């Protein structure tokens, strides 16, 4: 087992209707979600998961705590040119906005996602902007794939046609960063809901059944789940969190 560290790179927060995360649960509620890239700190390559949302798109009244990716990387002693690999969980505009910042990086995306993103269906068109990635020479993947020793992608479509989650080996087990947009409550529903499988489906989906099944696929593949938009990571320096003793599967941390 490798000993990677996951460093959350929060570049802002956004207030959204809760049901966009938790499929029809919490109608009328507004929550604050985190907007992130994720730096994977390891022995060799500098790896980034997603490039996050462009600042211009976050500067509206419901956005707060906005900071640039360059500033976040500086916290880790890095510059954008130091990034070797970028893994795109999917190609919606809020996850792929800063590709041009990383001139030396090799980019990975799923083939199905790329093909959809360059000519999206009208029902999903407003989530994509190919200008953000049209100059990127992606390595296009076809399903589950190892990226480097200790880091692999798990094909988890449903949120989009080509969503991929990322599995990272750490000293406490395999950490899974969801490729689909969700919060901790998707994997920790209120007891009163009495859900069959212990999950709440995501609220934004291309295929709801596929999305649900792939939530379970990811949960079964890892020991610790990082929900992609969970606000908790705004003030977390690294995962695994040193102060926590990890002794149970599927802890949301």
Where are these regions (language model features)?
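Basic, amphipathic N-terminal segments that precede the first structured/catalytic domain
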Residues: 1-29, 145, 166, 240-241, ...
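Residue-level marker for buried hydrophobic side chains located in beta-strands
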Residues: 47-49, 87, 107, 175-177, ...
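Conserved beta-strand hairpin/beta-sheet module of binuclear metal-dependent hydrolase folds
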Residues: 11-71, 165-183
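Short, conserved loop/helix-junction motifs that constitute active-site signature segments
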Residues: 100-103
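Short, glycine/acidic-enriched loop or turn micro-motifs at the edges of active sites
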Residues: 53-54, 93, 113, 181-183, ...
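Metallo-beta-lactamase
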Residues: 67, 72-78, 82-94, 106-155, 161-238, ...
């Amino acid at each position: 087992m490798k000993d990677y560290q996951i460093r959350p790179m929060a570049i802002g927060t956004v207030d959204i209707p809760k049901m966009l995360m938790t499929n029809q649960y919490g109608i009328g509620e507004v929550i604050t979600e985190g907007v992130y890239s994720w730096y994977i700190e390891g022995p060799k390559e500098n790896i980034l998961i997603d490039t996050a949302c462009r600042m211009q798109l976050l500067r509206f009244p419901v956005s707060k705590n906005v900071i640039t990716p360059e500033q976040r990387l500086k916290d880790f002693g890095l510059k954008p040119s130091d990034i070797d690999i970028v893994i795109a969980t999917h190609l919606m505009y809020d996850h792929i906005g800063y590709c041009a910042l990383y001139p030396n990086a090799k980019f990975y995306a799923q083939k199905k996602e790329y093909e959809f993103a360059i000519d999206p269906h009208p029902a999903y068109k407003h989530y994509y902007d190919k200008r953000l990635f049209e100059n990127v020479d992606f390595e296009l993947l076809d399903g589950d794939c190892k990226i480097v020793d200790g880091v692999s992608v798990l094909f988890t479509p449903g949120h989009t046609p080509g969503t991929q989650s990322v599995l990272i080996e750490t000293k406490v087990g395999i950490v899974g960063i969801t490729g689909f947009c969700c919060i901790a409550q998707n994997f920790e529903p209120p007891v009163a809901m009495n859900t069959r499988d212990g999950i709440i489906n995501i609220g934004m989906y291309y295929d709801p059944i596929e999305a649900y099944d792939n939530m379970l696929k990811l949960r079964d593949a890892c020991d610790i789940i990082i929900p992609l938009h969970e606000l908790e990571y705004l003030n977390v320096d690294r995962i695994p969190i040193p102060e926590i003793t990890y002794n149970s599967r599927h802890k949301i941390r």
